[in-house]
């Protein structure tokens, strides 16, 4: 006789950091998000990046065309900041409801970020405009200097970029995305109400040992890179505390299998199919399920000044095996936790 399964009912969540790509990949991955989440902040790092209102409107339409009938999903678009971006274009997009936020990628920090910002000073007029109109700034918080160790790039970013920026523009709303270190967890926790953070499932579940000991696991390779276990533990403690300025952002970032399993593999975990159950597992392990709904469904809208979703979903606690792969037109996509047995999943 099997034990009765446990059901967890929560307000429909949102994903505050998501990569959907474009073309066939977009069509493949969108349904994995749209069946679960009400909204998602969509990253603009296409090639070429989304830097105009027209490009964002067109991209939003391509996303909506990929949403299956019966899914109620709203993509929230972002503008990719560049050294040459016109502040008026950004403000127009924000006022017209096209841009929800703008994304700062330090040049060459991650996938398709070669057009990114060379220095904060180069975009100060844009940032000043964002502060004035109340537009959130989303930050990939890593320095990219060649002499800075990859495991130190987030901590160094806080002291050399993030803190000086926030001291200069004190009213600017900032989301420190996909934080991975104790340094960042402490910084956000000790900050004011204009600073928030997202955390991915992989950074809560794993540390660099899981990626590197006993063989390299390319499907755990993402940026910012997994850190040592003391940092993982700090992130877990932050979410388990019920802190209300940290929220769900999967950073789901699909790449075809041959681009991950390569002599020079791409960074990114495609976790959209398994992320919500992964978060539930972490909260359960931390005896913090009472804070799970707020992390998934309340804290993000609260920071962005948006209403919470008015529908609900259920997760069920019963073991099931994650698919080994998902078909693409001419390759496959390997989901986060592929082939593994997981405890929680969204009830269909």
Curated annotation (Swiss-Prot):
Active-site residue list: 251
Subunit relationships: Homodimer.
One GO MF term: zinc ion binding
Cofactor list: Zn(2+)
Keyword flag Hydrolase: yes
UniProt xrefs under Gene3D superfamilies: Metal-dependent hydrolases
Pathway assignment: Pyrimidine metabolism; UMP biosynthesis via de novo pathway; (S)-dihydroorotate from bicarbonate: step 3/3
Keywords on record: Hydrolase, Metal-binding, Pyrimidine biosynthesis, Zinc
Record's cofactor remark: Binds 2 Zn(2+) ions per subunit.
Organism placement in taxonomy: Bacteria, Pseudomonadati, Pseudomonadota, Gammaproteobacteria, Enterobacterales
One Pfam family of this chain: Amidohydro_1
One Gene Ontology cellular component: cytosol
Name of the protein: Dihydroorotase
PROSITE patterns, sorted: DIHYDROOROTASE_1, DIHYDROOROTASE_2
Known EC number: 3.5.2.3
């Amino acid at each position: 006789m099997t034990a009765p399964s446990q059901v967890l009912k929560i307000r429909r969540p949102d994903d505050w950091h998501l990569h959907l790509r474009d073309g066939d990949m977009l069509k493949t991955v969108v349904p994995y998000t749209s069946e679960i989440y009400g909204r998602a902040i969509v990253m603009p790092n296409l090639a070429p990046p989304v830097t105009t209102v027209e490009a964002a409107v067109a991209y939003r339409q391509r996303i909506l065309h990929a949403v299956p009938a019966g899914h109620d999903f709203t993509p929230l678009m972002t503008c990719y900041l560049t050294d040459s971006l016109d502040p008026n274009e950004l403000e127009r997009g924000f006022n017209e409801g096209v841009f929800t936020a703008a994304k700062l990628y330090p040049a060459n920090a991650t996938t398709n970020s070669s057009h990114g910002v060379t220095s904060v000073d180069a975009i100060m007029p844009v940032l000043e405009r964002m502060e004035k109109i109340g537009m959130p700034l989303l930050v990939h918080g890593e320095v990219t200097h060649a002499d800075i160790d990859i495991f130190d790039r987030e901590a160094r970013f806080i002291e050399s970029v993030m803190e000086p920026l926030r001291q200069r523009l004190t009213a600017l709303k900032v989301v420190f995305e996909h934080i991975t270190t104790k340094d960042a967890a402490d910084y956000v926790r000790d900050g004011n109400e204009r600073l928030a953070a997202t955390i991915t499932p992989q950074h809560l579940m794993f540390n660099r040992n899981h990626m590197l000991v006993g063989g390299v696991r390319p499907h755990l390779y993402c940026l910012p890179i997994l850190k040592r276990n003391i940092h993982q533990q700090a992130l877990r403690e932050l979410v388990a505390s019920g802190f209300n300025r940290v929220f769900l952002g999967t950073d789901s970032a699909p790449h075809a299998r041959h681009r991950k399993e390569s002599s020079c593999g791409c960074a990114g975990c495609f976790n959209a199919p398994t992320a919500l159950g992964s978060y539930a597992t972490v909260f359960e392990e931390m005896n913090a399920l009472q804070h799970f709904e707020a992390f998934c469904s309340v804290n993000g809208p609260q920071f962005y000044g948006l209403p919470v979703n008015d529908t609900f979903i259920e997760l069920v606690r019963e073991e099931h095996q994650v698919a080994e792969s998902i078909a693409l037109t001419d390759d496959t996509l390997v989901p986060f936790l592929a082939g593994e047995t997981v405890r929680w999943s969204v009830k269909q």
